From Swiss-Prot:
Pathway: Metabolic intermediate biosynthesis; 1-deoxy-D-xylulose 5-phosphate biosynthesis; 1-deoxy-D-xylulose 5-phosphate from D-glyceraldehyde 3-phosphate and pyruvate: step 1/1. Keywords: Isoprene biosynthesis, Magnesium, Metal-binding, Thiamine biosynthesis, Thiamine pyrophosphate, Transferase. PROSITE patterns: TRANSKETOLASE_1, TRANSKETOLASE_2. This is 1-deoxy-D-xylulose-5-phosphate synthase. GO terms for cellular component: cytosol. GO terms for molecular function: 1-deoxy-D-xylulose-5-phosphate synthase activity; magnesium ion binding; thiamine pyrophosphate binding. Catalyzes the acyloin condensation reaction between C atoms 2 and 3 of pyruvate and glyceraldehyde 3-phosphate to yield 1-deoxy-D-xylulose-5-phosphate (DXP). Pfam families: DXP_synthase_N, Transket_pyr, Transketolase_C. GO terms for biological process: 1-deoxy-D-xylulose 5-phosphate biosynthetic process; isopentenyl diphosphate biosynthetic process, methylerythritol 4-phosphate pathway; terpenoid biosynthetic process; thiamine biosynthetic process. Homodimer.
Amino acid sequence: MSLDISNYPLLALASTPEELRQLPQSALKQLSDELRQFLLTSVGISSGHFASGLGTVELTVALHYVYNTPFDRLIWDVGHQAYPHKILTGRRDKMHTIRQKNGLHPFPWREESQYDTFSVGHSSTSISAALGMAVTAEKEALGRKVVAVIGDGAITGGMAFEALNHAGDLHKDMLVVLNDNEMSISENVGALNNHLAKLMSGRLYTTIREGGKKVLKGMPVIKEMAKRTEEHLKGMVVPGTLFEELGFNYIGPIDGHDVNGLVETLSNMRDLKGPQFLHIMTKKGKGYEPAEKDPIGWHAVPKFDPTQFRKPATKPGLPTFSQVFGKWLCDIAAKDEKVLAITPAMREGSGMVEFSQRFPQQYFDAAIAEQHAVTLGAGFACEGYKAVVAIYSSFLQRGYDQLIHDVALQRLPVLFAIDRGGIVGADGATHQGAFDLSYMRCIPNMVIMAPSDENECRQMFYTGYCYNEGPSAVRYPRGSATGAEQIEEMTALPIGKGVMRRQGQKIAILNFGTTLAAALTAAESLNATVADMRFVKPLDEALLLELAASHDVLVTVEENAIMGGAGSGVLEFLASKNRLKPLLQIGIPDEFIKHGGPEEILSELGLDAAGIEGQIRAFIER
């Protein structure tokens, strides 16, 4: 994507932070405007995360202007807001490739740039990483500064507060910037806080404050009185008491779209000792009216024309698996008021908007707190309620101990609706749902289901709802369903029983999940038997023994890591019965899968029809 210098005269001069720092401060306002316009244009071409980046343009410019990056360490939490950072750190001309196969990574990524000091994608990790870097910076004594940027959503995660607590205790030199795009403050209060922030971050205030501490060191009563007076005065206009109590010097809130004000405040704070906390107010979607009005809807966008001020119309088509879940949840809640559903800040993505509106007393958003969400469900189940935890596969990893200790160990009937199982595509390695079958299969008392289509998915949700002997999980992929007819009537499936889908000879394909259509297509060319296993745990042992006895070769197919997955379960069972046959496991290899289109990734992994057939033929010919 070449840069039209006539439209971006200053941005053309700031390809890297080193070039940015050569510009006069008076040019930063225009540079920010050009950067925001370039972001609009580039995301319109590429698709991707949108509203968050529009809100951090001025902050990004100010941070790279004040801090000596990459020597100074800058860590972005999650990374949705880091597109301006990528543009200013040598990747401007590749922005049209972001989230595409062999293109720029969707998040800051250490392997991609020296300016990406910590690879991210999941929430609430930045402060812990920054503290680790601050500790080592002190040991090296090179004068390196460390900054973590975290949003008001990510800071709700427990890990962020654990890190804040530890950072306050260790008292290392570091800065945490809270990008707050939720709170609304009036202009008067905002102006007061902007002035107060400059005053309190300035050298005069800091010198008086630290000098006063030394003078009053021998007079503890007066020192305590002075401390309380300062806290009281700050508390009247500054909502930062919590962070002060954690050991941080709190500054703010200030206007996050005043680039010159940010530069002044950051310049003052850069050399302050100990943990610093800067609270800035921004507007998600800043500078693009549709995104300002609907920041959730414009959080991530497909390719679009920014001049049209609307996203392209969605073509009517098949429902997504998330929508199938949302409809089932509404249907069952209408019949049972003891159904309580939980999501860790993924209402829209998990298909729960309608449910939250129709059944607000049965809906719980636990925020970005997966550990809490899982154990909250355990608490519901203890009291005889039916807990449904809707969670992404890659995020359930963060509540793994709770899944084992708080749910499975107590055999609590919590139903996990695990979205984004398998390949998710453009969000890349941090979000691929490659491990859930493996990490759940080893947990005692778990029932794990993998539907082959949307109707089977609906019936499995009902099966989990009816199951009261312990926890159950239904894992399903991102995106559109298969087009199977959905049967409104809900019927509980027999636990641990698969079904035959095609009778063939010599080769038996044991399919787990939505790869069934590809497996059936491959089976036509191979004249292979196909079984829709349905249950990863417990396995249909009778069906496995029957297929092993009547076929020469067994093949397992799953959109999950081969290591420890459903195929491993089949192999373990047959070995325990001394009924081993040549067995090919088809799935995700032992590597992190990069970003790209889901179809092209599945094809590359050999998980489409041609790939399944090719792998089976190669296995037979060995």
